[in-house]
A protein has these predicted regions:
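Acidic active-site catalytic centers that drive phospho-/nucleotidyl reactions
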Residues: 111-112, 151
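Metalloprotease/metallohydrolase-associated module, dominated by Zn2+-dependent proteases
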Residues: 23-67, 74-85, 89-91, 98, ...
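Extended, hydrophobic alpha-helical membrane-active domains that insert into or remodel lipid bilayers
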Residues: 1-37, 103
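Short pre-active-site segment immediately N-terminal to the catalytic Zn-binding motif
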Residues: 86-87, 94-110
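Polar low-complexity intrinsically disordered regions
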Residues: 1-10, 114, 160, 175, ...
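Catalytic Zn2+-binding segment of zinc metalloproteases
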Residues: 113-132
Length: 188
């Protein structure tokens, strides 16, 4: 809607003016990514955190902060224009810094996908058991956030998930291949 009125009042109908509208649509389509079980879970078991994730994604987009939206394995990755602040996951919505893409070889996505797996497993307990403690540690921890138990659990879940689907995934970077699990940034 914002893009329509901008074009109407400025008579500038270039494709750049429709970027946030396209991103809003892609964010909305995130509700319907994945298999039937993932979609059903999103509307029931994971509904509280999914609503917050969708709201956060659309709010970022409202202020023209969303660069791209991509999907993988039921998750929606929302890439922002901001550099190197990290990311956070609420339900199936992963919001992260510039460079985030829904790709198993994307280091930030790997880790955040682990939080999505936590959400799927814990349902309505996710916010209290994982999201809030992780956020609190990010804000008030002693600088070793990647070793916090919630983060370690996310890493363990994600590496197990990806290793099951991509044989040898856990060791590829150790062999000098620029794909697979990023052990340096996301240790187990």
């Amino acid at each position: 809607i914002k893009d329509f009125f901008h074009g109407l009042f400025t008579w500038n109908w270039s494709s750049e003016n429709w970027h946030s509208t396209v991103m809003a649509f892609k964010i909305d389509m995130g509700w319907f990514q994945g298999n039937f079980g993932q979609i059903l879970s999103r509307f029931t078991w994971e509904l509280p955190q999914t609503l917050f994730g969708h709201l956060g994604s659309q709010t970022e987009n409202l202020f023209e902060g969303v660069k791209s939206v991509s999907y993988y394995g039921g998750a929606t990755a929302v890439e922002t224009y901001s550099a190197k602040w990290g990311g956070f996951t609420l339900g199936s919505f992963i919001i992260g810094h510039r460079g985030l893409h829904a790709d198993p070889n994307n280091s930030l996505f790997q880790h955040e996908y682990g939080h999505y797996l936590q959400s799927r497993a814990s349902g309505p307990l996710y916010l209290g058991k994982y999201a809030i403690p992780s956020f609190y540690d990010t804000m008030f921890g002693r600088g070793n956030h990647k070793y916090h138990s919630v983060e370690q659990d996310a890493n363990a879940r994600a590496i197990k998930y990806f290793e099951k689907r991509i044989p040898g995934f856990a060791d590829r970077r150790n062999k000098g291949i620029n794909e697979g699990w990023d052990h340096y940034n996301y240790p187990i």
